[in-house]
């Protein structure tokens, strides 16, 4: 099977997902320079019902249009808000309701950008899509592999690990071979409106709002006790869903007699008792895990796990590669790490690598403590 990307660029129609940011802007420009037939598409994935625009969608659309006008390409628009609500946001709420800390960007990539957008672009007659993600692809015979982006500070393979190889084969990643300063320099050189635009951070549909204010619109808070590892009650929490493992800020603990000056950290969320367990010190033993379990893993391409396999893994974005052994178990997959892993968080994703190849990953179900808990 020949990858669609290997066709003559002049005969290949590519629709670029235009976010209104500098990365997708430069992606479209580079594809134009490479001779592809390029069009853009701006997708709106969130509908506000209060008349506000926390996602800055209006401003982002204007920026995307300005860039497309500048480089002379057509801009399509599409509304995937219904798909986003059904396939991303409802899952996001269910995870928080269950006491976990989800990452909606990963699900958005799988369900929206590389499914809804890809299908829509193909329906418009596109041969390929392109995005501004900092990843690379490599075609090896019948498979297309997902590789880390060349810029280690911007590599986004962690967020694309749940996208299948067939979808990767339909996608170009023009900025994956570049470093961020190069991308901004290209945008500035060509007078693109997004050249100096700040990178978007945080979750789109929350925007500038306080996370707790947003979440309580959809989920009822269940206040409870804050306890030490010895079971001493030292405060109250407003809801376990507002806290994550390793969190330091916003606990409201202070002025405790004989507690010392070391900061408090979230060590554990006891869902059965609705208790937030905390302890002092950045190196508290309860913060460290030796292994984790994931019930399901999405592989970019099928891999052989008939016996344990030595790989590297990340349990959070921008973490360095961590040596581990991955094996199948009756309950899913178990990754045993060579070194202690700090703040392994159920609901977040563990992503596995073989060198620069992103193999896939899954949602962390549980973490095994590095040392026994009394």
UniProtKB/Swiss-Prot annotation:
Residues 154-156, 316-317 are annotated as: Interaction with tRNA. Residues 103-105 are annotated as: Interaction with target base in tRNA. Keywords: ATP-binding, Cytoplasm, Disulfide bond, Nucleotide-binding, RNA-binding, Transferase, tRNA processing, tRNA-binding. Its EC number is 2.8.1.13. The record marks 133, 348 as: Interaction with tRNA. GO terms for biological process: tRNA wobble position uridine thiolation. Disulfide bonds join 108-204. GO terms for molecular function: ATP binding; tRNA binding; tRNA-uridine 2-sulfurtransferase activity. Belongs to the MnmA/TRMU family. This is tRNA-specific 2-thiouridylase MnmA. It comes from Pseudomonas entomophila (strain L48).
């Amino acid at each position: 099977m020949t990858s669609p990307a290997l066709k003559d660029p002049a005969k290949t129609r590519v629709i670029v997902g235009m976010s209104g940011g500098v990365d997708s802007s430069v992606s479209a420009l580079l594809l134009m320079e490479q001779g592809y037939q390029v069009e853009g598409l701006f997708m709106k994935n969130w509908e506000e019902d209060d008349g506000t625009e926390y996602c800055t969608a209006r401003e982002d659309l204007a920026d995307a249009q300005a860039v497309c006008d500048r480089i002379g390409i057509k801009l399509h628009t599409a509304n995937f808000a219904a798909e986003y609500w059904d396939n991303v946001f409802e899952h996001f709420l269910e995870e928080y309701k269950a006491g976990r800390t989800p990452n909606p960007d990963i699900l958005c990539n799988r369900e929206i950008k590389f499914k809804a957008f890809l299908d829509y672009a193909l329906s418009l007659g596109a041969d390929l899509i392109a995005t501004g993600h900092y990843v690379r692809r490599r075609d090896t015979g019948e498979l297309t592999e997902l590789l880390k982006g060349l810029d280690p500070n911007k590599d986004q393979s962690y967020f694309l690990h749940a996208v299948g190889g067939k979808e990767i084969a339909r996608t170009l990643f023009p900025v994956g071979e570049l470093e961020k300063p190069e991308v901004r320099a290209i945008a500035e050189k060509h007078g693109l409106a997004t050249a100096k635009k700040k990178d978007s951070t945080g979750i789109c549909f929350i925007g500038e709002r306080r996370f707790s204010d947003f979440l309580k619109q959809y989920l009822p808070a269940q206040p409870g006790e804050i306890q030490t590892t010895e079971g001493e009650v030292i405060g109250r929490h407003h809801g376990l869903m507002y806290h994550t493992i390793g969190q330091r800020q916003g606990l409201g603990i202070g002025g405790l007699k004989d507690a010392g000056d070391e900061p408090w950290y979230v060590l554990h969320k006891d869902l059965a008792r609705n208790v937030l367990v905390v302890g002092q010190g950045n190196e508290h033993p309860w913060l460290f895990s030796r292994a984790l379990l994931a019930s399901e893993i999405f592989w970019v391409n099928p891999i052989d796990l008939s016996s344990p396999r030595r790989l590297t893994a990340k349990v959070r974005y921008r973490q360095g590669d961590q040596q581990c052994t991955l094996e199948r178990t009756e309950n899913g997959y178990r990754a045993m790490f060579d070194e202690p892993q700090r703040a392994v968080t159920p609901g977040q994703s563990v992503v596995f690598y073989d060198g620069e190849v992103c193999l896939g990953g899954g949602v962390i179900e549980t973490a095994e403590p590095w040392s026994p808990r009394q």
